[in-house]
């Protein structure tokens, strides 16, 4: 018997709901009550705030246990993260769906199989996720082709529209960081394709491929680190909340406040790995389209690189603004644009990328998504090796 059911009622679930049921309920309701969906409702922001608080309390085992036993008086409100931030980290912003699609975590949360009972068919879930991911990539590739077609028709108008997009998307939760991540992949993938024109073993092309490969591996390791950090934080919070008499209320509040950033940063790392892997494949579909002529593909690559650089400028602009820099929403402190100098080493280029966060030991483990008592690995698409990397470039762009 729970003392209060208000948070359960807000999510529309019973007090016996599983973690998966709570997550799915939040995913559905958050998209319904999000302020962007209800611009004329003066209560929209409040409703979204309450929904976010309910989800954060009930999705944390320690907080949920305290809420069930004592109601709202037993939970730490200081540990509540801005609902707009947590929504963006879990499911992304709808403003960015035309660029990154539905994030993998959102796809996992929305799978119907989550409510089918305690028995999970991991192979079936993996196959569903692969299908959803393929549909996501194909849809994004078509959108990107249409967008780059504007570059072919009118370059000046394309640049003007891209700059307007930056102004619009920068206002979304973590919009600047999203733009920076998207811009980085666009620039690197375009540079790799444009490098195919070189002779002498296609050295620029191979260099870009190795840079992309190295960045991809680093991104996956960082994602694993993020998952591991979340696991450690969850276990430590359980330990802190279950220990009696060894801490003051002020000490516990300080601990929870200090780890807000760890939670957001860890979720961000997982999302970055998903976004980057997806966009790499999308760019390959667009820039290696067998139905397009060679010169058209080169024009697409030039347009993609231009778009990526415009997106990356949002990060530089925000970091030159003291008001932007003072906001706690910032995830990174590095301000160097990824493509200020394309001749710099991969190491220096990576140093400013948005996967960076607090210096943590790199985990050698691959993240495993857990369902009930079973686990399975969700593999993001890997970048394809450069065809003919060890041969003279005869099949690339001439």
Swiss-Prot record:
Region described as Disordered: 315-398
Keyword DNA-binding included in the entry's annotation: no
Domain J: 6-71
Alphabetical keyword list: Chaperone
Main function: Plays a continuous role in plant development probably in the structural organization of compartments.
Assigned protein family: Belongs to the DnaJ family. C/III subfamily.
Protein name: Chaperone protein dnaJ 10
Organism whose genome encodes this protein: Arabidopsis thaliana
């Amino acid at each position: 018997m729970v003392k209060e059911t208000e948070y359960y009622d807000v999510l529309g679930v019973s007090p016996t709901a599983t973690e998966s049921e709570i997550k799915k309920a939040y995913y559905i309701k958050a998209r319904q009550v999000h302020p962007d969906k209800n611009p004329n409702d003066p209560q929209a922001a409040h409703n979204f705030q309450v929904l976010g608080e309910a989800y954060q309390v009930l999705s944390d085992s320690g907080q949920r246990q305290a809420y069930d036993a004592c109601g709202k008086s037993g939970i730490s409100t200081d540990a509540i993260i801005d609902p707009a931030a947590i929504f963006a980290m879990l499911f992304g912003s709808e403003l960015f769906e035309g660029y990154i699609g539905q994030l993998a975590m959102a796809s996992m949360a929305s799978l119907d199989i989550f409510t089918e009972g305690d028995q999970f068919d991991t192979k079936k879930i993996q196959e569903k996720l692969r299908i959803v991911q393929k549909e996501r990539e194909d849809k994004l590739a078509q959108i990107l082709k249409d967008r780059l077609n504007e570059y072919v028709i009118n370059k000046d108008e394309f640049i003007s529209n891209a700059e307007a997009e930056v102004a619009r998307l920068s206002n979304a939760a973590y919009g600047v960081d999203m733009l920076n991540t998207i811009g980085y992949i666009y620039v690197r993938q375009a540079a790799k394709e444009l490098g195919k024109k070189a002779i002498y073993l296609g050295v620029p092309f191979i260099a870009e491929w190795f840079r992309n490969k190295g960045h991809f591996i680093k991104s996956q390791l960082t994602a694993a680190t993020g998952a591991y950090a979340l696991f450690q934080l969850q276990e430590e919070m359980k330990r802190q909340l279950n220990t009696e008499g060894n801490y003051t209320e002020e000490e516990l509040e300080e601990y929870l406040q200090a780890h807000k950033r760890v939670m957001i940063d860890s979720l961000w790392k997982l999302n970055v790995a998903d976004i980057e892997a997806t966009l790499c494949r999308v760019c390959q579909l667009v820039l290696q389209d067998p139905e397009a002529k060679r010169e058209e593909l080169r024009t697409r690559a030039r347009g993609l690189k231009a778009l990526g650089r415009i997106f990356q400028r949002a990060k530089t602009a925000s970091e030159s603004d003291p008001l932007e820099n003072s906001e706690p929403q910032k995830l990174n402190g590095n301000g160097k644009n990824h493509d200020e100098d394309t001749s710099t080493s991969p190491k220096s280029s990576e140093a400013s990328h948005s996967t960076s966060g607090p210096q943590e030991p790199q985990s050698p483990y691959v993240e495993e998504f857990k369902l009930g008592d079973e686990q399975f690995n969700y593999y993001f698409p890997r970048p394809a090796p450069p065809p003919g990397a060890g041969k003279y470039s005869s099949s690339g762009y001439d």
